[in-house]
Amino acid sequence: FPNVQMLPLDLRELFRDTPLADWYTAVQGRWEPYLLPVLSDASRIALMWKFGGIYLDTDFIVLKNLRNLTNVLGTQSRYVLNGAFLAFQRRHEFMALCMRDFVDHYNGWIWGHQGPQLLTRVFKKWCSIRSLAESRACRGVTTLPPEAFYPIPWQDWKKYFEDISPEELPRLLNATYAVHVWNKKSQGTRFEATSRALLAQLHARYCPTTHEAMKMYL
C-alpha cells in the first residue's frame, strides 16, 4: 500500500519537551507489571499532543470514514472511557491535561490506571462532572457512546466468533464507526475465514485484502 508507512518509534524523542520526559527517564530499568501497556498509553497521548490526527489500536476493524471525527474519544461502558480510539487536533489542551495527569497521579501497578481510567478522570475534570452520564460533550471534546467503537463489551468478546446472518450484520453495527475486537482476550482463538462468524464476515467485508490472505491458509 503506497499510502502506508512504517516508522520507528523513538520514545525518548517522542516524550521530549512534554511532561512525560522525566517520567520516562525515571522508569527506565524499573520493573513494573504493566510497563508495556503503560508505555503504549503514554505514547498515544504524546502523539496526539505533538501531531494530532487519529489513533487506533491495531485490533480495530474500521467500518466508516473517520475524518469527520475531531476531538473525540469513545465510551467503553457507562463508567469508563477508552483510549483505543482517539481523534484530536494537534496540541489540544485536553491532551496536555492527560499528560500532566499521567505524571501527577502515576500508578503503574493498577491495570488501566494510566489508560482508560486516566481518560475518564481527565474528562470528568474537563467537564466538571462526577459521572459520565452527566455529559457526553463539553468545551469542544465529545465522547461517543459504546456502539461507536465498542459495540460488543470485552466481557462478551466470544460473540465475535459466533455465527451471525449477513442480514443482521448491518443492523448490529449501524451506529458503529470501527469495531474493537479485544485482542487481549481473543488472541489465539481460531475460526474459519469463510465461516459466518461475525469476525470472519467483518474481515470479508471491510478487510478484503487481509481476508484473501487468510483464505490462503485454509
UniProtKB/Swiss-Prot annotation:
SUPFAM superfamilies tied to this protein: Nucleotide-diphospho-sugar transferases
Q: What is its EC number?
A: 2.4.1.228
Where is the protein localized?
Answer: Golgi apparatus membrane
What protein name is recorded for this chain?
Lactosylceramide 4-alpha-galactosyltransferase
PANTHER family per the UniProt record, alphabetical: LACTOSYLCERAMIDE 4-ALPHA-GALACTOSYLTRANSFERASE, LACTOSYLCERAMIDE 4-ALPHA-GALACTOSYLTRANSFERASE ALPHA- 1,4-GALACTOSYLTRANSFERASE
Q: How does it sit in the membrane?
A: Single-pass type II membrane protein
User: Which family does the record assign?
Assistant: Belongs to the glycosyltransferase 32 family.
Instruction: Supply the source organism for this entry.
Output: Pongo pygmaeus (Bornean orangutan)
Write the gene name. Answer: A4GALT
What enzyme category does the UniProt record give?
A: transferase
Q: Which GO terms describe its molecular function?
A: lactosylceramide 4-alpha-galactosyltransferase activity
Free-text function comment from the UniProt entry = Catalyzes the transfer of galactose from UDP-alpha-D-galactose to lactosylceramide/beta-D-galactosyl-(1->4)-beta-D-glucosyl-(1<->1)-ceramide(d18:1(4E)) to produce globotriaosylceramide/globoside Gb3Cer (d18:1(4E)). Also able to transfer galactose to galactosylceramide/beta-D-Gal-(1<->1')-Cer. Globoside Gb3Cer is a glycosphingolipid of the globo serie, one of the major types of neutral root structures of glycosphingolipids, that constitute a significant portion of mammalian cell membranes.
| Cellular component terms per the entry's GO annotation | Golgi membrane
Query: Which pathway features in its UniProt record?
Result: Glycolipid biosynthesis
Pfam families annotated for this entry?
Gb3_synth, Gly_transf_sug
Q: Which reaction does it catalyse?
A: a beta-D-Gal-(1->4)-beta-D-Glc-(1<->1)-Cer(d18:1(4E)) + UDP-alpha-D-galactose = a globoside Gb3Cer (d18:1(4E)) + UDP + H(+); a beta-D-Gal-(1<->1')-ceramide + UDP-alpha-D-galactose = alpha-D-Gal-(1->4)-beta-D-Gal-(1<->1')-Cer + UDP + H(+)
Keyword annotations for this protein, in alphabetical order, are:
Glycosyltransferase, Golgi apparatus, Lipid biosynthesis, Lipid metabolism, Membrane, Transferase
Q: Pinpoint motif DXD motif by residue range.
A: 57-59
Read off the domain note: The conserved DXD motif is involved in enzyme activity.
The domain of life is Eukaryota
Presence of the UniProt keyword Glycosyltransferase in the record:
yes
**What's an example Gene Ontology biological process for this entry?**
glycosphingolipid biosynthetic process
